[in-house]
Amino acid sequence: TQANDPANVDSIRHAKLLYISGGDQNRFMDAVAGSAIEKAIHEAYRNGAMVGGTSAGAAVMSAVMITGNARKKTGYSSTFNTIETDNIETRPGLGMLTKSIVDQHFVKRSRHNRLISAVLEYPKLKGIGIDESTAILVKGKDAEVVGNSQVLVYSNTKRSKKFVKSGKLGARKMMLDI
């Protein structure tokens, strides 16, 4: 496969800039998970390469990646109507960001419920909602917002998840930074 082709792997391993385009984050991870390409991306990053992505390419940066699918609702919707337990489908991403979950097209597509649900399901992780035409530049523990819109960061400060009646999720003292 192309994900294990030595020429592709070598090209990525020695790259100074890797940019992962949009599309479907699940298809990307299906193609690269466990492959030599995935290892080469991490090696390039450790060697100082800048790794970035847009849309699905931003979503794959997380260790815990939102797939975009709801477990309890059939059919695709860009937003989630409720904040409830076991509704957010996740899978392993590239793991470039190990302490946060990234969601994309955030403000434009009103994905607050989806990211809040993910942060409640994974209370040790921050939720980073990146809007369209906007990016975060992460260097070590610092992040800078650039672009035309906003980045919202949800933190579950008590690192707890509370089940409310009917399978809904709740929490106290969540923090929002814009």
Residues covered by each model-derived region:
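N-terminal beta1-alpha1 cap of cysteine-dependent amidohydrolase-like domains
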Residues: 1-22
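Catalytic-core regions built around general acid/base machinery
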Residues: 11-14, 35-48
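Catalytic nucleophile loop
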Residues: 21-22, 45-65
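Glycine/threonine-rich flexible loop motifs
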Residues: 25-35
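Glycine/Thr-rich phosphate-binding loops of Rossmann-like dinucleotide-binding domains
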Residues: 28, 62, 69
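C-terminal and late-domain segments of enzyme folds
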Residues: 65-67, 71-178
